[in-house]
């Protein structure tokens, strides 16, 4: 029985101090991130990452540490309540009165209680040497109480350190991380060596260099040269790699959320309550079957075709078998099947309207809440596009223009618009389709030409020349 109580107390104490030690290590990581903050801002001198990327990367790393700190502190406080309920004096007296000094397992257990995980995972020889010291310290109850108090004071200092780091972090975030004037001032100070005159913008920063007096290749070379002179190339490469990894991961994660999250929410709503509610409402409160004139026309044409096929089947069967069949009963049966089919089709049209509204609403919410991630995605797409060769850029532009506004594109637009109207439950109207087909590609072509003239021609004139050459 005493051994079971001892095992329970040992588990509580190990978890108690282990949680606090983990929170202490995470607070050290936060302090390290704060110390490296200015070096991360220097990465923007190469203009390969936007300010949103740097700020969100630092914020995400700090939030990870905060999550583990809060989790370990929560477990620490829960176990502390249990220990206070039992009584620290009772636990200390129990351990001092029931520890067998000659038992190596118990000695190692006591050492594990009052040691960090890293210290306990050392070699067996080091554990044996510590064990000898521990035996000397446990000769009397007085020495044991002294050791217990010593480790208690040590971990209380660690707890005070963690609380101080958390309080300091709030002030640091408001003054440094989220203070964009200070952030841009630091960026501009690092860029004075490279003759940058335009201040960096938090909301409009791009993944490539802004147009200025000095060519971009020269500023990039000077930035790398300064890094080599200062001897910070290794740390610069590590930080650059971390930012690039975070940049790509956040962009892909945001694209996946924009694609799959609206679809997942609509499917959950549809399967949980939406489909059953619409079916019950339509079948009980509505007397009609068709929701638009197009459904009636299609149903009538289908019924006429079925009637003609039944007449043909009946004529063939009477000639072969010589027995007349009831044509009216067969037509009535097929009519009921058509009514059930178009009744379900009407339910699906209404269901599509609700699910499309939910999907669009979810997408808008994601775009509003993820403005910073959208800016990172924008800079990542631009970085990927501008890292391609001029020939590949021109090829992609030509492929997009030929698919959307090329010679054969009107037929594709007509099919797409017909499918959209049918999905929304509208009847086919050739005048509306012709109007949309004749106007929408023209608007898209105008926007593309404006983008080439206003933006692409300034960023890379060689792309425009290659584009016109391939287009001709």
Curated annotation (Swiss-Prot):
Bilayer-crossing residues are 249-269, 349-369, 395-415, 432-452
Q: How does it sit in the membrane?
A: Multi-pass membrane protein
Gene Ontology cellular-component annotations: chloroplast inner membrane
Q: Where in the cell is it found?
A: Plastid, Chloroplast inner membrane
GO terms assigned for molecular function: antiporter activity; proton transmembrane transporter activity
Q: What does this protein do?
A: Contributes to K(+)/H(+) antiport activity by supporting proton efflux to control proton extrusion and homeostasis in chloroplasts in a light-dependent manner to modulate photosynthesis. Prevents excessive induction of non-photochemical quenching (NPQ) under continuous-light conditions. Indirectly promotes efficient inorganic carbon uptake into chloroplasts.
GO biological process annotations for this chain's record? Answer: potassium ion transport
**Superkingdom field:** Eukaryota
Question: What is the protein's name according to its record?
Answer: Potassium/proton antiporter CemA
- Keywords of the record: Antiport, Chloroplast, Hydrogen ion transport, Ion transport, Membrane, Plastid, Plastid inner membrane, Potassium, Potassium transport, Transmembrane, Transmembrane helix, Transport
Coiled-coil features, chain-numbered ranges: none
Similarity section? Belongs to the CemA family.
The cross-references to PANTHER family, in alphabetical order and at most eight, read:
CHLOROPLAST ENVELOPE MEMBRANE PROTEIN, CHLOROPLAST ENVELOPE MEMBRANE PROTEIN-RELATED
Q: What is the lineage of its organism?
A: Eukaryota, Viridiplantae, Streptophyta, Coleochaetophyceae, Coleochaetales
From the UniProt record, list the reaction(s) this protein catalyses.
Answer: K(+)(in) + H(+)(out) = K(+)(out) + H(+)(in)
């Amino acid at each position: 029985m005493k051994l079971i109580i001892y095992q329970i107390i040992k588990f509580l104490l190990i978890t108690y101090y282990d949680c606090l030690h983990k929170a202490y290590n995470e607070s050290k990581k936060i302090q390290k991130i704060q110390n490296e903050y200015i070096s991360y801002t220097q990465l923007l001198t190469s203009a390969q990452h936007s300010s949103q990327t740097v700020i969100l990367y630092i914020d995400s790393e700090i939030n990870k540490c905060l999550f583990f700190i809060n989790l370990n502190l929560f477990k620490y406080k829960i176990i502390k309540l249990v220990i206070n309920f039992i009584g620290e004096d009772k636990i200390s007296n129990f351990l001092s009165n029931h520890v067998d000094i000659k038992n190596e397992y118990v000695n190692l257990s006591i050492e594990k209680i009052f040691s960090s995980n890293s210290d306990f995972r050392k070699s067996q020889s080091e554990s044996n040497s510590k064990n000898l010291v521990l035996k000397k310290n446990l000769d009397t109850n007085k020495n044991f109480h002294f050791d217990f108090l010593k480790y208690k004071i040590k971990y209380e200092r660690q707890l005070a350190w963690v609380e101080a780091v958390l309080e300091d972090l709030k002030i640091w975030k408001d003054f440094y991380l989220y203070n964009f004037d200070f952030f841009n001032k630091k960026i501009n100070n690092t860029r004075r060596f490279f003759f940058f005159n335009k201040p960096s913008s938090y909301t409009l920063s791009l993944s490539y260099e802004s147009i200025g007096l000095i060519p971009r290749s020269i500023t990039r070379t000077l930035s790398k040269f300064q890094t080599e002179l200062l001897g910070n190339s290794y740390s610069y490469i590590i930080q650059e790699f971390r930012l690039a990894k975070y940049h790509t991961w956040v962009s892909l994660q945001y694209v996946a959320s924009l694609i799959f999250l609206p679809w997942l929410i609509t499917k959950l709503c549809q399967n949980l309550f939406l489909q059953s509610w619409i079916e019950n409402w339509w079948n009980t409160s509505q007397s009609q079957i068709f929701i638009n004139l197009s459904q009636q026309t299609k149903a009538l044409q289908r019924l006429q075709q079925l009637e003609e096929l039944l007449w043909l089947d009946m004529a063939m069967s009477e000639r072969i078998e010589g027995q007349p069949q009831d044509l009216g009963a067969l037509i009535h049966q097929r009519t009921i099947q058509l009514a059930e089919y178009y009744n379900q089709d009407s339910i699906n049209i209404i269901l599509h309207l609700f699910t499309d509204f939910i999907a669009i609403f979810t997408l808008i919410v994601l775009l509003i809440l993820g403005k910073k991630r959208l800016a990172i995605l924008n800079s990542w797409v631009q970085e990927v596009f501008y890292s391609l060769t001029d020939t590949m850029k021109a090829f992609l532009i030509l492929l997009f223009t030929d698919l959307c506004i090329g010679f054969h594109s009107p037929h594709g637009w007509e099919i797409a618009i017909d499918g959209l109207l049918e999905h929304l439950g509208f009847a086919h109207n050739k005048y509306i389709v012709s109007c949309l087909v004749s106007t929408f590609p023209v608007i898209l072509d105008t926007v593309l030409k404006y983008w080439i003239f206003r933006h692409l021609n300034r960023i890379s004139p060689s792309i425009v020349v290659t584009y016109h050459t391939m287009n001709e």
